């Protein structure tokens, strides 16, 4: 962010961009975009750490994306290093967590349906020091 950069000498900073940046394909067909993976993360984190319902998170998601487009995306190419934080097994965990949530939300049902061919996994398979822990329910 240039506002912060002007106060830190370039030789004293190292910029890291961390995000789930993997699109998911099934038999050559796009199943989920990387931002769909991120909405799964956001729905579950908000539910368990912010007491925000899944439906409420879905309602504000477009505003969240707008904020990213305005305040994060323009600067991601300035990062010295990019880390793709996607874990191949995380969708299996989300399937298990979300299966008990019923909703009239077409968006939630579409997202849940996109996981139909995935196996279910317990959140306990995620290592305790994984960045994924930020998005999982705490026991």
Report each predicted region and the residues it spans.
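Conserved NTP phosphate-binding and transfer environment spanning the P-loop NTPase/kinase superfamily
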Residues: 2-139
């Amino acid at each position: 962010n240039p506002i912060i950069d002007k106060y830190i000498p370039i030789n004293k900073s190292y910029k890291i961009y961390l995000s789930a940046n993997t699109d998911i394909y099934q038999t050559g067909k796009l199943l989920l975009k990387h931002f769909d993976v991120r909405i799964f993360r956001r729905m579950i984190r908000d539910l368990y750490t912010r007491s925000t319902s899944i439906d409420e998170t879905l309602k504000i998601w477009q505003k969240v994306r707008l904020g990213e487009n305005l305040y994060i995306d323009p600067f991601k190419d300035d990062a010295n290093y990019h880390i793709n934080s996607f874990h191949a097994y995380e969708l299996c965990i989300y399937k298990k967590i979300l299966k008990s949530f019923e909703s009239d939300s077409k968006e939630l049902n579409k997202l849940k349906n996109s996981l139909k061919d995935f196996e279910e996994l317990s959140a306990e398979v995620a290592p305790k020091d994984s960045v994924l822990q930020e998005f999982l329910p705490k026991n």
